[in-house]
From Swiss-Prot:
It is found in: Secreted; Secreted, Extracellular space. The keyword Secreted applies. Several active peptides may be produced by proteolytic processing of the peptide precursor. Peptide hormone that functions as endogenous ligand for the G-protein-coupled apelin receptor (APLNR/APJ), that plays a role in cadiovascular homeostasis. Functions as a balanced agonist activating both G(i) protein pathway and beta-arrestin pathway of APLNR. Downstream G proteins activation, apelin can inhibit cAMP production and activate key intracellular effectors such as ERKs. On the other hand, APLNR activation induces beta-arrestin recruitment to the membrane leading to desensitization and internalization of the receptor. InterPro entries: Apelin. The gene is Apln. Keywords: Angiogenesis, Cleavage on pair of basic residues, Developmental protein, Gastrulation, Hormone, Secreted, Signal. One of its GO terms (biological process) is positive regulation of heart contraction. PANTHER family: APELIN (PTHR15953:SF0). This is Apelin.
Amino acid sequence: MNLSFCVQALLLLWLSLTAVCGVPLMLPPDGKGLEEGNMRYLVKPRTSRTGPGAWQGGRRKFRRQRPRLSHKGPMPF
């Protein structure tokens, strides 16, 4: 009877720990810690809003710099 009581107490302790933590106290299958294992799901790479487009990033390189317009003087073009 004492053995079954100890087993029930250990089972209750284990279930309460897993309910509080949300997961069993083990490492994820990739072998990293709990925080490093979940990091790939939390962080997403930055992407542009419009997508790559036809220029594929070369637009800045070939764009002609426009002169600044001032309030005084003639128009530059």
